[in-house]
Structures are given as C-alpha cells and as structure tokens.
Amino acid sequence: MNIIEIKELNRYFGEGENTVHVLKNISVNIEKGDFVAIIGQSGSGKSTLMNIIGCLDTATSGSYKIDGKETNELTSDQLSDLRSQKFGFIFQRYNLLSALTAAENVALPAIYAGKSQSERLARAEELLKKLGLDGKEKNKPSELSGGQQQRVSIARALMNGGEIILADEPTGALDSHSGENVLEILRQLHSEGHTIIMVTHDKNIAASANRIIEIKDGEIIDDTQKHPVQNTVNNQSKAKSRFGFSKDQLMEAFQMSVSAIIAHKMRSLLTMLGIIIGITSVVSVVALGNGSQQKILSNISGLGTNTMTIFNGTGFGDRRAEQMQNLTVNDANALAKQSYVQNVTPNSSSSGLLIYGNQSFTSTNLKGIGEQYFDVEGMTLKQGRSITAQEVRDNAQVALLDESSKKSIFPNDNPIDKIVMFAKRPFRIIGVVADRQMGAASSSLNIYAPYTTVMNKVTGGTKIDSITVKIADNVNTAVAEKSLTEYLTVRHGKKDFFIMNSDTIKQTIESTTGTMKLLISSIAFISLIVGGIGVMNIMLVSVTERTKEIGVRMAIGARKSNILQQFLIEAILICMIGGISGIMLSLIIGGIFNVFMTDFTMVFSTFSIVAAVLCSTLIGVIFGYMPAKNAAQLDPITALARE
C-alpha cells in the first residue's frame, strides 16, 4: 500500500534567466513501512525532494499525495497538521532548542498536537529511556554528546507517532560509532513499522535501507528494491488533529518568552526602559495633577462653599469701583430676606498701623464683618469667641486675629482681652480664627472687627466694599446667581456690581487642571510611543536571531498562528513588565515626594494605574504584532537553512 505517491513533480528556483530546474519530472511511489534511502551528490536535488515530501516545501508542478490526499490543495494550517501527525524529522545538525532540556525538546511536537502536559512528558521520558538516554531527561543539549543529541532528535521525531521518519544526513555530524548506533535505531524503527526515508550521499550508509533511489541533476537515475515490503503494524501512538490554541500552548509560549527575556537580560532591560519612563511619566503626572487639584480645591473651600461675593464696579479691572461705592448695608439686609439665601455679611476694610505696647506693625488689614462672616466664609474659630449681633449694632471696638497675626503680635502671650491700637482706636481682642487657605502667604496682619465699627469709627463712610452671600444648600448656585443679579439690578436701577461665584471658580480650576493633566500626559505618552518602537525594533532583531528556532517549530508541527502567538506574547510580556516597573517607580517617587513636600502631595488613583497597565499591554500588542507576523510568515525551509 502506497503511503506516498509522487507523479511528474517539478521544482524550480529563481525567475527569468536565473531559473534553476532542481527537480525534473520526478515520479515515485513509496510503500507504507518501507526503508528508503535517497542518495546523490550535493546539488542533485535529494534534499529538495525530501523537503517536499515532508511538506516543508511545495512543488512548482506535478502531484504529491499522502495517503491519497493531494498536498497541493492543502492550506498552510493543514500542512502544519500533516507535519505534526504524519512526519518526524531527524536533522543532520540535530536542531535542538538550546534553552530546553532533553525531555522538553522531545515533548515539543506534542504541544502543537494538543496533548496534555502529563501525557507528553511521560511519553518523552519513555522515548528517551527506549533510546538509551535514561537519566538525561533534564540535561540541556550543550550537556550531551553529538550521538546523544541525535538520539534526542530521533525521540522528538517519534513523539507524535512518527509514521514517516524523514532523516536528513542523520550520521553526517557523528563519528563512525555514533553513526552506526543511529542507523541501528533507524533499522529498529523500520522493523516496528515506521516508514523511513533517509537522505544521504554515502552509499555505505544507504546500504542499510531496503530501497535505494539515486538522484542526479534532479532526475531519478536508479531505483533498487532489495526485498518486498513487510506490512508490519505500526503501534506507535499518533497525534490527533487539533485546532486553535490550547492552555498548554499558551503556557509553553509564555515560558519560552520568559526564557528569551532572561537570556538577554541587558537588552530586555534597555527595551523596557522606554516603557518604564513613559509609564512613570504618565502615572506621576496624573498623580501630581490630582494632588495639586485637591490642594487648590481645598484652598477654594477657604472661600466658603456655596458662596458668592458681590463687589462694586463691573469687574476686578474696573478703576472706578472704589469711587462708585454702590453697595450698602440695606442691600445686604434685603438679600438676607431672599428664600435662596442662608446667610449674608456686609464687608468693609481699611489698612494702616497697628500698635501693641511698644511694637508697631505697619502692614495691617482691618476687615469689617458681620456676625455671620466666619460661617459664610467657612473659617474656623481657634480661640475665644466670635462677634455677636449686639456688638455689630453697638459699634463695639472688639476684634479677632488670624493665627499668623497672633503669632506675630503675641508670640508667647494669650491675646484674649489684650488691647491693640488701630487708627488711634483701641480694640479688645476676643478671639483667634484659622488663617484663610486661599491665596499665597502674606506678610500683612489681618484683624476682624464689626463692619459698623470700621465704617463709623475708622473709615467714616456709609458704603461697604462687598457683600458675601451664602446660598442655601438645596439651591443651584447658577440659578441663585441669576436671581441675585436680577434682584440687585432692579434694586439699583442698573447693573453696577459684579459677582464672584466660588462654585464657578472651582469648576474653572477643575477644568483647567484637567486640561493641563491631559496636555502633560499627552507629552509623556510620546515617550511610550518611542518605547513601543524600541520594543518593535528589538523584537525584529529577536526574530532574526531565532529564525532557526522558528523553522524547527514549523517542521515539528507549529502553525503560523502558533509562531505569531509566541512572539506576540513576548512583546506583550516585555511591555507589561515595563509598565508594572514604571508604576512601582512612580509610587516610589511619589512616596519620596510626599515625605519632603508639605504644600501638597502626589495622589495616585486606581484608574490611572489600571489604565497604565492596559496601555503598556496595548503598546505590546500594537508594536509586537509586526515582528510576530514577520516570524509567522517565514518559510520553513528558509528558516531552517539560517545559521
């Protein structure tokens, strides 16, 4: 029964004038269970014929059938399955993967055949023991002799059953004793029912075969059969057809990726560096943005929540505002009666010289306020008490200091009930309030007194500088601002004031800081792109370096999708490690920053960290795809020929 049928097969290489006719109208049938030696000098076409038989190459024309199935009609994946299920390759140079142990090399074809880990390792150990390599399962190829490596190669060929064993100069790299051992193994496999096809240029080695086919200049010139083929039953296990990716294939691809990264530590580190810098930059910038935003919003809370301050004039740049003085205490009283208003405080101010004992302080701001001022502005009383409504009505000469002023005037004394002089008027200190958070630190002192006292006894005016309004909690501040504007405009007969809404400021700052974070993150993202290009470059180099490995994997049954998966996982792994390292570096930087900085801290968010990991993974997919695709598109013969 013919297992291989070849009819009028031709193979050309090159194009045009450079075309070389390597195989010329080859027609040959090989029976199942035969031991065939294809002999010929270098350049005769014998290796090309074996490559076509092993589905590593395709004919230019003619017919090639295996078990009656026309190979010219098969897809790339179907040819890979055929190599996995039917063939076992024995190479002259062994072609073992140096990073794997003997057992792992033997078990490799079973991964692509879809066998479980336990099943393939058990069979690998069984085959190694059968071939006299018991105890060598964990040895790397570099720890084995040439003869031992070739026996590992034979065991690998038998892993999935090896119904057809293709041996390319199997003794070419061995001494005579080791070569004879290999030939004895091939004869034994033949007796067990395997179909053996051996390529050699040595007639003495070819003599071991039952049938000798001699090729010269691409043509069969002699075909000698010694004995009829015995139809011995082959009881070797055969690989089952498989599809898609199995868990074992993914795990093996992951392990090989880790091995490749470890094998080139410095190169891998330098490749990751671009990703590390990019991720560190993005995460740190977002953390800085979050921290500064929280600090600014915390400072804004010093203005009070749901508060609006009404000023004279049309805006902060209005030079006529001081002369206009349109706001009055009556305006404040009228606003206090509105349903959307919770509290109101008129404000007046003056600046001048403050005297305590034999000390004088030239830069002192006196703020005239109502009894509800500290509640409206969200300021905390630290010591003593606040101003009462009665004191406002009585023009009482009482005052409060902020904490900074207290430290300057009374560094070691209790300020309560002490008398200070301002504008030649005595003021009794009744309390201390927390410093306002909004704004930069100032060298000026701040004291607070009833606005009636400031107006009647200090400035001598009847107008006020501003009115601060606290809006009720259940009222929309934008609606309240519109209503307040309409009310005062009608009351004054014109709009001679402007309003500063604390919520509007907060929203503006949030928007601004968000825009700045986006801008700086975009700049940092560029370094990620550069890092991704570095990953792609190194992966292209890796594909070139490991071309031989790719050819071996394809020869033992790996599909293009398996090769694509292998290198894509490696690129993703490099980027993920780089991304995680970048996040850890950013957290370390943040920890150090937060220890030494007191104004604000770096605030890391879970979202930014998760986004960074996903981003680095995506970079690996995008920039790793092209090198992985290049690897998958390699021709098996070209890859195997690469040194």
Swiss-Prot record:
Entry-linked PANTHER family: MACROLIDE EXPORT ATP-BINDING_PERMEASE PROTEIN MACB (PTHR30572:SF14), MEMBRANE COMPONENT OF TRANSPORTER-RELATED (PTHR30572)
Quaternary context: Homodimer. Part of the tripartite efflux system MacAB-TolC, which is composed of an inner membrane transporter, MacB, a periplasmic membrane fusion protein, MacA, and an outer membrane component, TolC. The complex forms a large protein conduit and can translocate molecules across both the inner and outer membranes. Interacts with MacA.
Transmembrane intervals: 269-289, 523-543, 572-592, 603-623
CDD domains for this protein: ABC_MJ0796_LolCDE_FtsE
Main localization category: membrane
GO biological process, one term: response to antibiotic
Enzyme nomenclature, EC number: 7.6.2.-
Cytoplasm found in the keyword field: no
A Pfam short name: MacB_PCD
Residues that, per the record, bind ATP: 40-47
InterPro entries reported in the protein's UniProt record: AAA+_ATPase, ABC3_permease_C, ABC_transporter-like_ATP-bd, ABC_transporter-like_CS, MacB-like_ATP-bd, MacB_PCD, Macrolide_Exporter_MacB, P-loop_NTPase
Domain ABC transporter per the UniProt entry, residue ranges: 4-242
Protein name: Macrolide export ATP-binding/permease protein MacB
GO CC annotations on file: plasma membrane
Disulfide bond entries: none
Membrane topology note: Multi-pass membrane protein
Keywords per UniProt: Antibiotic resistance, ATP-binding, Cell inner membrane, Cell membrane, Membrane, Nucleotide-binding, Translocase, Transmembrane, Transmembrane helix, Transport
Record gene name: macB
Native species: Mannheimia succiniciproducens (strain KCTC 0769BP / MBEL55E)
SMART domains, per the entry: AAA (SM00382)
